[in-house]
Regions:
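Membrane-anchoring hydrophobic helices of lipid-metabolizing enzymes
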Residues: 5-138, 152
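Catalytic core of membrane glycerolipid acyltransferases/transacylases, capturing the structured
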Residues: 87-109, 119, 134, 138-197
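A structural micro-motif
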Residues: 123, 163-165, 274
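Generic preference for hydrophobic
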Residues: 127, 167, 306-308
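A cross-family acyltransferase "interaction/gating" segment
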Residues: 171-188, 213-319
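A Trp-anchored, charged/polar loop motif used as the substrate-binding/catalytic surface
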Residues: 198-210
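Accessory terminal regions of nucleic-acid processing enzymes
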Residues: 315-343
Length: 343
C-alpha cells in the first residue's frame, strides 16, 4: 500500500497498514515541527544571535561555532520546509510518482544545503577523482565519519557527477521530513538496524538496486554508523569472539570502523555488472556528534578532501568478498591517516 501524498514505500516494499499508520503519525509531528522551528529561529534571531555569540566569546572560541551552527540550523529548517512544500505541490499536480522531478528536487536541496554549510560554517569541499567515476550502474562504498556524510555524497553524486543516487539509509533518518518524503519517492531503502529478520533487510537492499542503468549509483556506508574510537574498539572486541583472525587484521584501523559485509554483498548480488567506486574523505574527523562539531569548528576551518577511486570487480576473483572489503578499508584508513599526519 502507498500513500502517494506522503511518498511511496521504502525501496523494499515493506509498507503495510501498520507502517502507513506509523508514517502518518511521524509526519504529522515532524513536518509542522520543522516548519515552526524555521519560523521560530528566524523571529528569535535578535535573541539567540547575541546570546550564542556571548557563549562563544566567553569560551574563547574564535571560530564562533555556536553562532555558525545555529545559522546553519535556520538554513536547514527553511530548506527542509521548502522541500516538503515542493513535494506536496508535486503530489497536488499528480507528479508524486515522477522519479525525474524528485531527483531534481533532491539535487536542488543538496546543493542549497552544501551552500549553506559553506556560508555559515566555512566548510570547503575539494573533490579529486570525479572524472574517475565509471559509467553506471555504479556501486559506491562510502566512508562514514560525520553527520554530514549523506548530504555531501548526495551533492557529490547528484549535483557534481550528474548521477541518480539510490541510498541504503538507516530508518532513523525518517525523522528528517524531506528525506522521509522525497527519499521514499525515489529508489532508496531505509534499513531497520534493529530488525530480527536480516534476510528481509538484505532483500530490501537488493530490490532497491535492481533495474539500475547507466546514470544510476547505489550508495552504501559499509561501516553502518559514524566512526569514532569508542565504537571502533567496541566492534573489534565483539569481533574477536566471532572471528579472531579478522579482528586481528582490522586492528590496524586507526580512523575507520570495520566494514559490514552483508549489505555490500547484497548490492553486488543485485548489480553483478556494476562498477565499484570507493569514496573517502578527510576533514570531518570528530564531527560524529553535535558537540564534536562545535569542538572541531572552534579549532580550525573545515576543509573536506574527497577522493574517488575505482575498484575493479575482477579483483574479487578467487577471494571472499569480506577479505576484499577488509583490504580496501585498510587501504583507505592508511590514506586517511597519511593525509591527517601531513595536514
Amino acid at each position: 500500500m502507498e500513500i502517494k501524498g506522503f511518498g511511496g514505500p521504502d525501496g523494499g516494499g515493506r509498507d503495510n497498514l501498520r507502517d502507513v499508520g506509523a508514517t502518518f503519525k511521524r509526519r504529522v509531528v515532524t513536518v509542522p515541527a520543522v516548519a515552526l522551528g524555521a519560523i521560530a529561529l528566524t523571529i528569535l534571531s535578535p535573541l539567540w544571535v547575541p546570546v550564542s555569540l556571548a557563549i562563544d566569546i566567553v569560551r574563547r572560541r574564535h571560530r564562533m561555532p555556536v553562532v555558525r551552527l545555529l545559522g546553519f540550523a535556520v538554513c536547514w529548517a527553511w530548506l527542509e520546509t521548502a522541500g516538503v512544500a515542493v513535494a506536496g505541490g508535486l503530489w497536488l499536480i499528480g507528479r508524486s510518482c515522477s522519479t525525474k522531478a524528485h531527483y531534481a528536487l533532491q539535487r536542488w536541496w543538496a546543493s542549497r544545503l552544501i551552500g549553506s554549510l559553506r556560508a555559515t560554517c566555512g566548510v570547503r569541499i575539494d573533490i579529486s577523482g570525479l572524472d574517475a567515476i565509471p559509467p553506471g550502474p555504479v556501486v559506491a562504498l562510502c566512508r562514514h565519519a560525520s553527520l554530514a556524510d549523506s548530504l555531501v555524497s548526495a551533492w557529490l553524486f547528484g549535483s557534481q557527477a550528474g548521477l541518480r543516487p539510490r541510498y541504503v539509509l538507516k530508518k532513523e533518518l525518517s525523522y528528517d521530513p524531506c528525506l522521509d518524503i522525497v527519499g521514499r519517492r525515489i529508489p532508496n531503502y531505509f534499513i531497520d538496524r534493529s530488525s530480527a529478520d536480516t534476510n528481509m533487510e538484505l532483500n530490501g537492499i537488493k530490490a532497491m538496486a535492481r533495474g539500475m542503468g547507466a546514470n544510476d549509483v547505489a550508495v552504501i556506508f559499509p561501516e553502518g554508523t559514524r566512526s569514532n574510537p569508542t565504537k571502533r574498539e567496541r566492534l573489534l572486541s565483539k569481533m574477536e569472539n566471532r572471528d579472531g583472525d579478522r579482528a586481528s587484521r582490522l586492528r590496524a584501523l586507526r580512523h575507520l570502523l570495520p566494514p559490514k559485509v552483508a549489505g555490500v554483498s547484497a548490492l553486488f548480488d543485485a548489480v553483478p555488472e556494476g562498477n565499484v567506486v570507493v569514496v573517502w574523505h578527510v576533514g570531518f574527523e570528530g564531527m560524529d556528534t553535535f558537540s564534536g562539531i562545535i569542538r572541531q569548528l572552534s579549532e580550525r576551518p573545515v576543509h573536506v578532501h574527497i577522493a574517488i577511486e575505482p575498484q575493479m570487480r575482477d579483483t574479487l576473483t578467487g577471494q571472499p568478498i569480506g577479505a576484499w572489503l577488509d583490504s580496501v578499508w585498510l587501504d583507505i584508513d592508511a590514506k586517511v591517516h597519511d593525509l591527517l599526519v601531513r595536514s
